[in-house]
């Protein structure tokens, strides 16, 4: 992808990057391991973002 991006696309990519985090360890410990992953995890190569 080009280094020069429109601001809107850059903001969308940044938001997607921040949302794509794992479940925190304290949440896994608090639920005794029943919650290990969240359903909105996105892999960079498999799933695409909206343009």
UniProtKB/Swiss-Prot annotation:
UniProt region (Disordered), positions on chain: 32-51
Record keywords, A-Z: Ribonucleoprotein, Ribosomal protein
GO MF terms held by the record: structural constituent of ribosome
Alphabetized PROSITE patterns for the sequence: RIBOSOMAL_L39E
A Pfam family: Ribosomal_L39
Single Gene Ontology BP annotation: translation
GO cellular component annotations of the record: ribonucleoprotein complex; ribosome
Basic residues: compositionally biased ranges: 33-51
Family the UniProt entry places it in: Belongs to the eukaryotic ribosomal protein eL39 family.
Protein name stated in the entry: Large ribosomal subunit protein eL39
Species for this entry: Methanococcus vannielii (strain ATCC 35089 / DSM 1224 / JCM 13029 / OCM 148 / SB)
Source species taxonomy: Archaea, Methanobacteriati, Methanobacteriota, Methanomada group, Methanococci
């Amino acid at each position: 992808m080009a280094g020069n991006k429109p601001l809107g696309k850059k903001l969308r990519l940044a938001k997607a990057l921040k949302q794509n985090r794992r479940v925190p360890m304290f949440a896994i410990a608090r639920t005794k391991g029943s919650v290990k992953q969240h359903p909105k995890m996105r892999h960079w190569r498999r799933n695409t973002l909206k343009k």
